[in-house]
From Swiss-Prot:
Protein's name according to its UniProt entry: CXXC-type zinc finger protein 4
Gene Ontology terms for molecular function: methyl-CpG binding; zinc ion binding
Zinc finger boundaries on the chain: CXXC-type: 122-163
InterPro entries tied to this protein: CXXC4/CXXC5 (IPR040388), Znf_CXXC (IPR002857)
Length: 188
C-alpha cells in the first residue's frame, strides 16, 4: 500500500481532502435518497459519508453532463466522474481507470492536427490517390536508393510513389492562358 492510501481512502475521523472539496462544491443540492446499493458498498468499504457515496450514483441525471460542473475545479478521481456521468454498468466498469477517462475525453474534444514538419497549418497535405499503378503496388522493390537507404532516409520506394505526388504542388492548378495585349487593341 502507498503511504497516502490511508489519507485517500479516508480515516474514520474525517473525509479525504478531495472529497471535502467535492462536498463543498456541488454535492449540497443532492439528498440522501439519491443513494443506491452501490453507494452503501462505498460507505462500507471506503468509510466515506453519504455525500461521498452520492458521487457514485446520480439516477436522475443519467447520461447527461449537465449535472457535473466543469471538471477543472474538481479534484476527484476521473473514474468517479465518468461513472457518475455515464451511470451504466458497462460504461462504469470500462471507465474506472484514468486512461479510460482520457480516451472518453479525446472522442468528445476536437483537436488541432498540425503537420508533423511544423509547416503552414493552412497548407493542405498532399495524399496518395490510390488508383494509379504505383499506389496499387503493395511491396517495395528493394533495389532503388530509397529502399537501400531505409535506415537513413524515410522516402517511399521509387516504384511506389504516386503519380500525383510526383507532380509539383503548383502544377495541379490549371492555368488559363492570358490573352496578349494585341487581342484588346480594338478597345484603344
Amino acid at each position: 500500500m502507498h503511504r497516502n492510501d490511508s489519507q485517500r481512502l479516508g480515516k474514520p475521523g474525517g473525509a479525504p481532502e478531495s472529497l471535502q472539496m467535492a462536498n463543498n462544491n456541488f454535492l449540497s443540492t443532492l439528498s440522501p435518497e439519491h443513494c443506491r446499493p452501490l453507494a452503501g458498498e462505498c460507505m462500507n468499504k471506503l468509510k466515506c459519508g453519504a455525500a461521498e457515496a452520492e458521487i457514485m450514483n446520480l439516477p436522475e441525471r443519467v447520461g447527461t453532463f449537465s449535472a457535473i460542473p466543469a471538471l477543472g475545479g474538481i479534484s476527484l478521481p476521473p473514474g468517479v466522474i465518468v461513472m457518475t456521468a455515464l451511470h451504466s454498468p458497462a460504461a462504469a466498469s470500462a471507465a474506472v481507470t484514468d486512461s479510460a477517462f482520457q480516451i472518453a475525453n479525446l472522442a468528445d474534444c476536437p483537436q488541432n492536427n498540425s503537420s508533423g514538419a511544423g509547416g503552414n497549418p493552412a497548407k493542405k497535405k498532399r495524399k496518395r490517390c490510390g488508383v494509379c499503378v504505383p499506389c496499387k503496388r503493395l511491396i517495395n522493390c528493394g533495389v532503388c536508393s530509397s529502399c537501400r537507404n531505409r535506415k537513413t532516409g524515410h522516402q517511399i520506394c521509387k516504384f511506389r510513389k504516386c503519380e500525383e505526388l510526383k507532380k509539383k504542388p503548383g502544377t495541379s492548378l490549371e492555368r488559363t492562358p492570358v490573352p496578349s495585349a494585341e487581342a484588346f487593341r480594338w478597345f484603344f
